[in-house]
């Protein structure tokens, strides 16, 4: 049921192997890098006083380790992880909780997602959803309200046209 809900055409054994590999990667991977242009994009948002958050289905130990290793912890006001909520994506709870902690109405939030389950969660929460297509694992983001392939190109999206570079 979990594999079906996550929309992943893999076996349980493959999922367990991938989870172990990903955990090791977040904690020890020498090639762990942020997506190209992400630092600049986050800096531009922060320079304008725009609050930011992370809402992930991954457990907090891995996300916080990765954010720390990437020196990105300070770029986010809120971090919500899979073990901090009762229901994970595609349920909207992670996004609703993040919006609440940011002091924002979900309709005032932009979700950046690279998976169908995350896009459904963001839309169910009432957020505008930007589908990111620059991840190494490409998934269908056609249900998103907007798409972006490279964070360097953020100013091509009307929502960000007036966002000053950091």
Sequence positions of predicted segments:
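Helix-loop "lid/cap" segments that line or gate small-molecule binding pockets
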Residues: 1-9, 66, 98-99
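Metal-dependent phosphoesterase signature
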Residues: 3-39, 48
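Short, flexible loop segments at the rims of nucleotide/cofactor-binding pockets, characterized by
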Residues: 28-33, 57, 125-126
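Residue-level marker of regulatory loop/turn positions in helix-turn-helix DNA-binding domains and
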Residues: 34, 55, 87
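Asp-based, Mg2+/Mn2+-dependent phosphohydrolase catalytic module
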Residues: 43-46, 59-166
